[in-house]
Amino acid sequence: MTPYAVAITVALLIVTVSALQVNNSCVAFPPSNLRGKNGDGTNEQYATALLSIPWNGPPESLRDINLIELEPQVALYLLENYINHYYNTTRDNKCPNNHYLMGGQLGSSSDNRSLNDPQTMLWPEKKEDEKNCQETFKGACSCTKRFCKGYFSVNIFGINLNISYSSGK
């Protein structure tokens, strides 16, 4: 091969590898600079990488996060971090006692109200303060002055889950 052919081949390889990396930018694993010495990221590093994934969709739509290759505890840690980050809520924030349930359930086990708006997973009778709640939580929710609810969906371990939060009394 002539030097020109080698240069062209190398350039094509670089372009191909770059294109593949762009296509894989949605993977939940952190970039190499966030990984530990052995190539394994800590929980915090994985969470940082996951939360840095851009997403412009509405909170009630599916954000596809593939965590199937992660250990279950790491994946659940990331999920909790994502919820807290996205809704700007923690257990000691404006709405205390937040809890998160999987599988499409809303509210606590003592909450016997039925889900009567499956399209948005909101309780229509609670929409009077929805604007205030959206400003507080930056997400879809339904709330009164003392109570807020909402949800989003993720794909974890190949299963679509509706993650809901409920706070207040």
From Swiss-Prot:
Keywords: Unfolded protein response. Induction: By the unfolded protein response (UPR). GO terms for cellular component: endoplasmic reticulum. The keyword Nucleus does not apply. GO terms for biological process: endoplasmic reticulum unfolded protein response. It comes from the Eukaryota. Present with 721 molecules/cell in log phase SD medium. Involved in the unfolded protein response (UPR), a transcriptional response which up-regulates genes that enable cells to cope with misfolded, endoplasmic reticulum-retained proteins. UPR is part of the endoplasmic reticulum quality control (ERQC) which prevents the exit of misfolded secretory and membrane proteins from the endoplasmic reticulum. This is Unfolded protein response-inducible protein 1. It comes from Saccharomyces cerevisiae (strain ATCC 204508 / S288c). The gene is ULI1.
